[in-house]
């Protein structure tokens, strides 16, 4: 994700979350000729995030360093309260004009493309020859140039998915 995207995010409101438990709705703005798109996304956090800061976070997350959002306010609440503490589901509106978007959930990609991205970003130890061969095969046959896009829309691995990826 390139830094200018974060400047386009504007905090709309936030919801206080006091239970354990980011929605992307794409809307056409204007007439058919004006296909500018705005999306609403949520970011779960222990803090109110008026303006996201680039470069903060874990570079070993699924898609690397970035500001992770979701289409689901419920999922944002879950992310906000992952350690049995209260948190916030920050809501943002983002104008997609002039931004490049890759959707890993489109028919153009499959689960092995996503697995390539996980293998590239997550840190774990690969032991055994077959595991190393499998990783090499995925890198050779299912690589995706996702780093050149402003927005990556795709799956998010929780620990059970990552266990699958590690086992693979």
Predicted regions and their residues:
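Conserved NAD+-utilizing ADP-ribose enzyme module
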Residues: 7, 13, 17-37, 61-62, ...
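Short aromatic-glycine-(Arg/Gly/Cys) micro-motifs in beta-strand/loop hairpins
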Residues: 39-60
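Short linear motifs at secondary-structure transitions and domain/linker junctions
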Residues: 41-47, 64-70, 165
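Extended catalytic/binding region for NAD+/ADP-ribose chemistry, centered on the ART fold
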Residues: 58-83
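Catalytic core of tubulin tyrosine ligase-like
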Residues: 90
């Amino acid at each position: 994700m390139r830094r200018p995207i974060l400047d386009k995010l504007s905090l709309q409101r936030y919801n206080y979350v006091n239970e354990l438990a980011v929605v992307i709705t794409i809307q056409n703005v204007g007439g058919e000729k004006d296909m500018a798109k705005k999306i609403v996304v949520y970011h779960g956090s222990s803090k109110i995030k008026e303006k996201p800061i680039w470069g903060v976070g874990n570079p070993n997350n699924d898609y690397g360093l970035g500001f992770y959002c979701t289409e689901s306010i419920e999922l944002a609440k879950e992310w906000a309260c992952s350690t049995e503490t209260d948190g916030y589901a920050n809501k943002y509106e983002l104008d997609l004009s002039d931004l490049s978007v890759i959707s890993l959930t489109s028919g153009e990609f499959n689960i092995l493309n996503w697995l390539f991205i996980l293998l590239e970003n997550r840190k774990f130890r690969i032991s055994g020859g077959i595991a190393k061969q499998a990783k090499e095969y995925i890198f050779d046959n299912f690589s995706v140039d996702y780093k050149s896009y402003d927005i990556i829309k795709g799956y998010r691995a929780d620990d059970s998915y990552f266990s699958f990826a590690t086992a693979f």
